[in-house]
């Protein structure tokens, strides 16, 4: 097998996820109850057998660092690792100025490892992918660069790099986040082909392009705007169709599932995808597991069954993590992170509760995201009067109420 290296860009600030990113990097935001967003890309590489991963961090990385150090210990004796790489300022006293600059400032890692092929992936998407299939495509095409892509609705095209390909899958056009004149897919005027932000380079070509870009004072030093857009006309740049990627244990409904969780509404919906009876993305695929840090928390506990008084502890259509106690309350269509407590006579619906959230008695909460260490006092109602909620919390365009970490909530 060719010598491979994965460089994972995990330094994103994630401003559109505020307030969830006020105290943590975007890849460290909890997802699906017991995971962090970064776990999905790391699990894809681990399951694919790519076991040399460098995670480039920058913005408020403490919780991300701790999570990776605690949960991603590979076998050093076999030269397998997930290593955190902070901004080292090797080229001067400055932070990363873009995704391409992040690689340039860490070129020493690539030259030291001497991989034949280098993956450059983001750390802020939710999906399963066997990257070996992308590698095989790259080798078959003799590509210098392969970009993973997925169809998106035309109305969402302005959020992505939009690609045009020929009949052989070679890139013949690329526009980063077009505001007008979107090039649609052949035969389908409703969709455009979007870059997933996942790149596979033949390493020699990567080094050449990164060094060239670093010397361009007018460059944005961004992989989409600066590297891909400049490279496809003079190098062999091909586009890998992610919809053709087949993961063991994955059903037809899940194939091609990929979510950019860069906004609060998108993040909320991707979480809600998990709790459906027949989910479009399942966490229960033993043949392609999502790995994460393990915690020594006790089992979930449901207590009280006084149906006469309505004091019944139970959860329906929900994901409930270890250490939770549902004490005479009801969680419906929810995702509960570890050590959540829902007390008697309370109803929580269509919500995401982060670790160590405590819901007092007689509360009614719906369509909310509650960050860690929040205490909701008894008799509190959230999600039923959005005008009132806007005075206290952040409310998204679609009406999701977001409560920041450790906020003191008044009844």
UniProtKB/Swiss-Prot annotation:
It comes from the Bacteria. The keyword Nucleotidyltransferase applies. One of its GO terms (molecular function) is ATP binding. It holds the Pfam family NTP_transferase. GO terms for biological process: glycogen biosynthetic process. CDD domains: ADP_Glucose_PP, LbH_G1P_AT_C. Pathway: Glycan biosynthesis; glycogen biosynthesis. Its EC number is 2.7.7.27. This is Glucose-1-phosphate adenylyltransferase. It comes from Anaeromyxobacter sp. (strain Fw109-5).
């Amino acid at each position: 097998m060719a010598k491979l290296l994965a460089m994972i860009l995990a330094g994103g600030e994630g401003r559109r996820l505020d307030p969830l990113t006020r105290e943590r990097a975007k890849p460290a935001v909890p997802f699906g109850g017991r995971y962090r967003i970064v776990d999905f890309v790391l699990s894809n590489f681990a399951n694919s057998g790519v076991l040399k991963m460098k995670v480039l961090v920058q913005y408020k990385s403490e919780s991300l660092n701790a999570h990776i150090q605690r949960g991603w210990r590979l076998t050093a004796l076999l030269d397998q690792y997930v290593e955190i790489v902070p901004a080292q300022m090797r080229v001067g006293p400055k932070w990363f100025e873009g995704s391409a600059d992040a690689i340039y400032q860490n070129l020493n890692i690539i030259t030291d490892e001497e991989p034949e092929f280098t993956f450059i992936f983001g750390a802020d998407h939710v999906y399963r992918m066997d990257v070996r299939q992308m590698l095989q495509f790259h080798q078959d095409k003799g590509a210098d660069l392969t970009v993973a892509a997925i169809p998106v609705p035309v109305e969402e095209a302005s959020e992505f790099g939009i690609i045009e390909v020929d009949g052989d899958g070679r890139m013949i056009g690329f526009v980063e986040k077009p505001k007008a004149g979107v090039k649609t897919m052949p035969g389908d005027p409703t969709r455009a082909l979007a870059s997933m932000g996942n790149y596979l380079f033949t390493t020699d070509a990567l080094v050449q392009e990164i060094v060239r870009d670093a010397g361009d004072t007018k460059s944005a030093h961004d992989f989409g705007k600066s590297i891909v857009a400049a490279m496809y006309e003079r190098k062999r740049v091909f586009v890998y169709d992610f919809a053709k990627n087949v993961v063991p244990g994955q059903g037809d409904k899940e194939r091609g599932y990929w979510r950019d969780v860069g906004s609060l509404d998108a993040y909320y919906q991707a979480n809600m995808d998990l709790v459906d009876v027949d989910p479009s993305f399942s966490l229960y695929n033993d043949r392609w597991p999502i790995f994460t840090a393990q915690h020594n928390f006790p089992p979930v506990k449901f207590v009280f069954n006084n149906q006469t008084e309505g004091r019944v502890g139970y959860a329906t259509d929900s994901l409930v993590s270890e250490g939770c106690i549902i004490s005479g309350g009801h969680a419906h269509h929810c995702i509960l992170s570890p050590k959540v407590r829902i007390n008697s006579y309370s109803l929580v619906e269509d919500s995401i509760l982060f670790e160590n959230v405590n819901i007092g008695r007689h509360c009614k909460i719906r369509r909310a995201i509650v960050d860690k260490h929040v205490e909701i006092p008894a008799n509190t109602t959230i999600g039923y009067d959005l005008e009132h909620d806007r005075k206290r919390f952040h409310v998204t365009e679609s009406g999701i109420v977001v409560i920041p970490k450790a906020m003191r909530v008044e009844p």
